[in-house]
Curated annotation (Swiss-Prot):
Annotated Polar residues bias: 432-444
Binding positions for [4Fe-4S] cluster 2 per the UniProt entry: 208, 263, 464, 468
Similarity field: Belongs to the NARF family.
GO molecular function (one): 4 iron, 4 sulfur cluster binding
Function: Component of the cytosolic Fe/S protein assembly machinery. Required for maturation of extramitochondrial Fe/S proteins. May play a role in the transfer of pre-assembled Fe/S clusters to target apoproteins.
Protein name: Cytosolic Fe-S cluster assembly factor NAR1
Disulfide-bond pairs as recorded: none
Keywords assigned by UniProt, alphabetized: 4Fe-4S, Iron, Iron-sulfur, Metal-binding
Region of interest called Disordered, as start-end residue ranges on this chain: 25-46, 422-448
Signal peptide (UniProt feature, chain positions): none
Keyword ATP-binding annotated: no
Length: 597
């Protein structure tokens, strides 16, 4: 095979590692029952031994670098719809009562009981996938989820305790907070001299767990460039557990948080040791010995359909309208309630993309700070690589940024940022890695001119081609055909055998419908949308006021609530193990609750 093209460049899927260091203990083999020790037995006459199946849990994967990404390719026994059902049936719901004179909700149950408060957070990409599947609007998809999780005709209609979720929040709320803090992080990084806890320039987004997994395991030199901010999922978990535990006087372990996401890799993110109450809670005996995850369980959009099917419920048959006031419980704090359940719309436009709009928000903030400036867009060698330059009124570049989606493009970005090779020969000049990378890419002469990577101020990086609406956990065409069997009969002219396998055209059309539903969230919203640049600064100011209020309310610094850290994951696969305690060390790593991917 030519050195210019390798098999890894043909697609974006990175399979699990060949060698898995998961230690599987087995009993010694049974001794032969034959009376004659010299008897020869043919292999086809030997009865196969029924060995117990090896089970690999999520925490085992966190301590191993044998696999670089694609958590959906690993058989995971935890964080599934089964865990949701088992938890709902295992713990009774903690009684809550609304007290109007005290501006919030009170806990009327026992703080020491085994009861739980069930809360959930839902990403907008999940609602878009449901909307495209059932032919409804994004807002109706929100009503569908609320009715299923909180309403009397949903989960509360069955189960051992008739449990449901008390609050279901939109991760867009915490996404807005992350956007505001991202703009601050980029600003401070540009003004910084390179010291302190700020990431190095260019700052790379850190909301995609598949990308973080890849960086921690294969390219540790990238880690100083990663944004220190939590993802909207993680920040939602920190917010819910910190506020509710303080306001209701319960332990964070009594608050069970479910996240519904478009991506399987979000399950790995939720299992990180850095994303537990140890990072933000006050030091106590419980938090030191038993860390409590900010997100207890993550299920995908497809698993949401499986969850409903397991309870014998049909999502499209649920009322597509808002829950009555009798089914809604006010949040314990009125100020936080008005922000958390705001009716205003979020910025989900074609320009911002389908992955949260981190890059777009940074550009809009800097454009608002520089009146008369304009954003110039330059497409890269494919649709998933886009460069942006903020030009002043005098046509001077003020800020350069880029968007890289998909692992093929991420690998090109990593090559650009890789440090130069240091020659061991005295007097030799360092050899830049980018030069060899460019020699492997002869097609660049026909592509749009690309930046060097180091001149970017910010890069939005996502593992999935096309962004988060194309996440691995989204509803596939096959799932949509099963959920709505008559939806494609009128338009499909293929035979049943041919129609069973979606064509690339059908897959692109499906993704286009999901994207359309995602972008239509603003038109479905009950609030008004302001597009003036000054509104961006005004909105960021309100978000900073909210973050300050949250931090002061629970008496925890914002640096402990909104920021996290990353670490290099070293692999023992293929290394010579001379020390006698290597196996014990691997067992210890595999038994950890987290600490890297």
């Amino acid at each position: 095979m030519s050195a210019i093209l390798s098999a890894d460049d043909l697609n974006d899927f990175i399979s699990p590692g060949v060698a898995c260091i998961k230690p599987v203990e087995s009993l010694p083999q049974k001794e032969s029952q034959s009376e004659n020790p010299y008897e020869v037995t043919k292999e086809d006459k030997v009865q196969p031994e029924n060995l117990p199946p090896a089970q690999i849990s999520l925490t085992d994967c966190l301590a191993c670098s044998g696999c670089v990404t694609s958590a959906e390719a690993v058989l995971i026994s935890l964080q599934s719809h089964t865990e949701v059902l088992n938890t709902l049936d295992l713990y009774p719901e903690l009684p809550l009562d609304f007290a109007s004179d005290q501006r919030g909700t009170q806990n009327v149950g026992s703080a020491d009981s085994d009861s739980r408060i069930f809360v959930a957070s839902v990403s907008p990409q999940v609602r878009a996938s449901l909307a495209a599947t059932y032919g409804i609007t994004e807002r109706e998809a929100k009503y569908m989820i609320d009715q299923f999780l909180m309403g009397p005709h949903g989960l509360r209609a069955g189960g051992k305790h008739g449990n449901g979720f008390t609050w279901v929040v939109d991760t867009n709320v915490m996404r807005e907070a992350v956007l505001a803090l991202t703009a601050d992080e980029v600003t401070n990084s540009l003004l910084s001299t390179g010291s302190g806890s700020l990431p190095k320039s260019p700052i790379l987004s850190s909301a995609c767990p598949g990308w973080i997994c890849y960086a921690e395991k294969t390219h540790p030199f990238i880690l100083p460039h990663l944004s220190r901010l939590k993802s909207p999922q993680a920040l939602s978990g920190t917010f819910l557990k910190s506020v509710l535990s303080k306001a209701l006087g319960v332990s964070p372990s009594q608050i069970w948080h479910l996240a519904i996401m478009p991506c399987f890799d979000k399950k790995l993110e939720a299992s990180r040791e850095e994303l537990t109450d140890i990072a933000w809670a006050s030091t106590s005996a419980e938090s030191q010995t038993t860390p409590v995850r900010d997100v207890d369980c993550v299920i995908t959009t497809r698993e949401l359909l499986t969850l409903a099917s397991a309870r014998g419920l049909s999502l499209p048959n649920l009322p597509l309208k808002a829950l009555p006031a009798s089914c809604s419980t006010p949040f314990p704090d009125q100020a936080l309630d008005s922000f958390l359940f705001s009716k205003s719309s979020s910025d989900q436009t074609v320009e911002s993309g389908t992955s949260g709009g981190y890059l777009h928000h940074v550009l809009k903030i800097f454009q608002a700070r520089n009146p008369g400036s304009k954003i110039v867009t330059q497409r890269g060698r494919n649709a998933d690589v886009v460069e942006y330059v903020l030009m002043s009124s005098g046509d001077e570049p003020l800020l350069k940024a880029a968007r890289y989606y998909g692992f093929r493009n991420i690998q090109n970005l990593v090559r650009k940022l890789k440090p130069a090779r240091v020659s061991r020969l005295p007097g030799a000049k360092p050899q830049a890695v980018t030069s060899s990378a460019n020699r492997r890419q002869p097609m660049s002469r026909n592509a749009a001119p690309a930046g060097t990577g180091a001149d970017y101020a910010y890069v939005e990086v996502m593992a999935c081609p096309g962004g988060c609406t194309n996440g691995g956990g989204q509803i596939r065409i096959e799932d949509a055909r099963e959920a709505v069997p008559n939806a494609l009969k009128e338009t499909s002219t293929e035979t049943p055998v041919a129609a069973s396998k979606p064509t690339p055209h059908e897959q692109r059309a499906r993704l286009a419908r999901v994207d359309e539903a995602y972008y239509s969230a603003d038109s479905d919203s009950e609030g008004s949308v302001t597009t003036e640049p000054v509104s961006v600064l005004s909105r960021d100011t309100k978000i900073h006021e909210f973050l300050k209020y949250w931090s002061e309310k629970i008496d925890i610094p914002l640096s402990q609530l909104a920021y996290t850290s990353y670490r290099e994951v070293e692999s023992d696969v293929g290394k010579t193990q001379n020390a006698p305690n290597e196996t014990a060390r691997v067992v210890e790593l595999a038994g950890k609750i987290g600490g890297g991917w």
